[in-house]
Curated annotation (Swiss-Prot):
<keyword id="KW-0520">NAD</keyword>
<dbReference type="GO" id="GO:0003951">
    <property type="term" value="F:NAD+ kinase activity"/>
</dbReference>
<dbReference type="GO" id="GO:0046872">
    <property type="term" value="F:metal ion binding"/>
</dbReference>
<keyword id="KW-0521">NADP</keyword>
<dbReference type="GO" id="GO:0051287">
    <property type="term" value="F:NAD binding"/>
</dbReference>
<feature type="binding site">
    <location>
        <position position="165"/>
    </location>
    <ligand>
        <name>NAD(+)</name>
    </ligand>
</feature>
<feature type="active site" description="Proton acceptor">
    <location>
        <position position="66"/>
    </location>
</feature>
<dbReference type="GO" id="GO:0005524">
    <property type="term" value="F:ATP binding"/>
</dbReference>
<dbReference type="GO" id="GO:0019674">
    <property type="term" value="P:NAD metabolic process"/>
</dbReference>
<dbReference type="GO" id="GO:0006741">
    <property type="term" value="P:NADP biosynthetic process"/>
</dbReference>
<feature type="binding site">
    <location>
        <position position="167"/>
    </location>
    <ligand>
        <name>NAD(+)</name>
    </ligand>
</feature>
<dbReference type="InterPro" id="IPR016064">
    <property type="entry name" value="NAD/diacylglycerol_kinase_sf"/>
</dbReference>
<keyword id="KW-0547">Nucleotide-binding</keyword>
<dbReference type="InterPro" id="IPR002504">
    <property type="entry name" value="NADK"/>
</dbReference>
<comment type="function">
    <text>Involved in the regulation of the intracellular balance of NAD and NADP, and is a key enzyme in the biosynthesis of NADP. Catalyzes specifically the phosphorylation on 2'-hydroxyl of the adenosine moiety of NAD to yield NADP.</text>
</comment>
<keyword id="KW-0963">Cytoplasm</keyword>
<comment type="similarity">
    <text>Belongs to the NAD kinase family.</text>
</comment>
Length: 287
């Protein structure tokens, strides 16, 4: 088995963990390859470009936050991703730094399980050709630098859902419901729910609300504006700039993201801790 290691080298703790992990793997004579930028900053090898890791490795290890895991999952395709959280509590990264070695040992002896997560697939036409992009968390169309409030036209399975004057539209998976969508007022959805949520960003009308739909729906979004370019983001990566009236088609991808599961992880506890639910009540309890 060969591991691909992707680390957020902007975080000192991730750097220390990467050195600890590679030292441990060396001591066990386990093969690994670091993503080239991580390897350069760490001064550790062997390394390869991130888009080559899927071809030469069996499983990815992400050292960082949810953003680092999203990056790793984008290149892992269907290969498992083991997420080690550094810093703030993550919704996607399943293990903390103290659990890292134990988690890797479980992978090596085959005693691990997988959480399958649904992805979005966004399709546009570019120079007469289809361009397809995938996202684990969300697909976002934003107003960008357009000086006015554009109108976003949304259709479900070809039927008009509505026209929203807003700063943007977020289409999120249940996994991504705790990311940008939540910040924009969208609901929190349990990770394995077979739904998507469409969340407007700063809508101009108070009656406009997020809507939860079945994940078998095909969503079409276009921007009704006279001019301008509108960023299309997949998991925070700007994939291209959309022209007025251009349509983006979003649906469930056929490919799943496979995350190495932490069976001791309590999702409800994560919500309470991350979102400070019940903190006032907890702090009032006698010691």
């Amino acid at each position: 088995m060969k591991f691909a290691i992707v680390a957020n080298t902007e975080r000192k703790e991730a750097v220390l963990l990467a050195k600890e992990l590679t030292g441990w793997l060396d001591s066990k004579r386990v093969s690994y390859v670091l993503e080239s930028l991580s390897a350069e900053k760490l001064g550790i090898g062997p390394s390869a470009k991130i888009d080559d890791l899927n071809r030469i490795c069996d499983i990815f290890i992400s050292l960082g936050g949810d953003g680092t895991l999203l990056l790793a999952s984008h290149y892992s395709e269907t290969k498992p991703v083991l997420g080690i959280n550094v810093g703030h509590l993550g919704f996607l990264t399943e293990f903390n730094k103290d659990e890292m070695i134990g988690a890797v040992e479980k992978v090596l002896d085959g005693s691990y399980s997988i959480h399958n997560r649904t992805q979005l697939e966004a399709t546009t036409m570019c120079n007469g050709r289809e361009q397809r992009m995938c996202a684990l968390n969300d697909v976002v169309i934003e107003k960008g630098t357009y000086p006015r409030i554009p109108t976003f036209v949304i259709r479900l399975d070809g039927e008009l859902l509505g026209s929203y004057r807003a700063d943007g539209i977020i289409i999120a998976t249940s996994t991504g419901s705790t990311a940008y969508s939540m910040s924009a007022g969208g609901p929190i959805i349990a990770p394995k729910s077979s739904v998507f949520v469409i969340t407007p960003i700063c809508p101009h009308m108070l009656t406009v609300r997020p809507i939860v739909i079945s994940d078998d729906k095909v969503i079409e979004v276009s921007v009704d504006a006279q001019a301008g370019e509108f960023p299309l983001n997949c998991d925070g990566r700007i994939t291209r700039m959309l022209q007025p009236q251009e349509t983006v088609t979003v649906k469930k991808s056929n490919d799943l993201i496979n995350l190495v599961a932490n069976e001791e992880r309590d999702y409800c506890e994560i919500l309470r801790t991350k979102l400070l639910w019940g903190r006032e009540h907890a702090s009032s309890q006698p010691e």
